Amino acid sequence: MIKIENLTKSYRTPTGRHYVFKDLNIEIPSGKSVAFIGRNGAGKSTLLRMIGGIDRPDSGKIITNKTISWPVGLAGGFQGSLTGRENVKFVARLYAKQEELKEKIEFVEEFAELGKYFDMPIKTYSSGMRSRLGFGLSMAFKFDYYIVDEVTAVGDARFKEKCAQLFKERHKESSFLMVSHSLNSLKEFCDVAIVFKNSYIIGYYENVQSGIDEYKMYQDLDIE
């Protein structure tokens, strides 16, 4: 379970402070993959980043005894002056036991298919190469929850299929916290839904289709 208590997150803007969330309270159940549904700017990705520990709230708590990934495929955190291998080794030291380091590095090297570039500085990589390394690194470690923000596969058609197969394998063993513009992907991978509107959560739904229906309804109301 992930328990969110009195969570507040805001940003300074030229016109004053903008609140993404204010005193948010919600529980995410164990063993359930959750679809986060809402318009752009509703706070879905911000909440995922805070759950994953790469952004901090102004106040409040996120309480869990589960392991949670960083956003799958995140490539922005690599150190450009280090090689792909060195970046992977650095992360592996944080998330794996000493005796597992070689295995994790070999997994990413084989999966990302970067050849000689795996031992070259990240700053020489194309965006696609960074994405392949980021996806492989995300999948190298087992988590109770994977954070999936609009990314399920990268690269050419063959590599995308390879990513999709591994993605499905991880889904058999773990839960996803997922944001996607593809409602079909949300229905395929998620069990329940949380629907966002502006800076608050409308509700928690025991099946994804109910959440999608609610989302479509308030969209229609806003248009009218």
Swiss-Prot record:
Keyword presence, GTP-binding: no
Entry's localization field: Cell inner membrane
Keywords, alphabetical: ATP-binding, Cell inner membrane, Cell membrane, Membrane, Nucleotide-binding, Transport
Superkingdom assignment: Bacteria
Membrane topology value: Peripheral membrane protein
PROSITE patterns attached to this UniProt entry: ABC_TRANSPORTER_1, ABC_TRANSPORTER_2
Binding positions for ATP per the UniProt entry: G38, R39, N40, G41, A42, G43, K44, S45
SUPFAM superfamilies: P-loop containing nucleoside triphosphate hydrolases
GO CC terms: plasma membrane
InterPro entries for this protein: AAA+_ATPase (IPR003593), ABC_transporter-like_ATP-bd (IPR003439), ABC_transporter-like_CS (IPR017871), ABC_transpr_TagH-like (IPR015860), Bact_Polysacc_Export_ATP-bd (IPR050683), P-loop_NTPase (IPR027417)
Record-linked SMART domains: AAA (SM00382)
GO molecular function: ABC-type transporter activity; ATP binding; ATP hydrolysis activity
Record Pfam families: ABC_tran
Gene3D superfamilies documented for this protein: P-loop containing nucleotide triphosphate hydrolases (3.40.50.300)
Ranges for domain ABC transporter: 2-223
Function: Putative ATP-binding protein, and an energy coupling component for the transport of polysialic acid across the cytoplasmic membrane.
PANTHER family (alphabetical): TEICHOIC ACIDS EXPORT ATP-BINDING PROTEIN TAGH
Family listed: Belongs to the ABC transporter superfamily.
Protein name, UniProt field: Polysialic acid transport ATP-binding protein KpsT
Gene source species: Escherichia coli
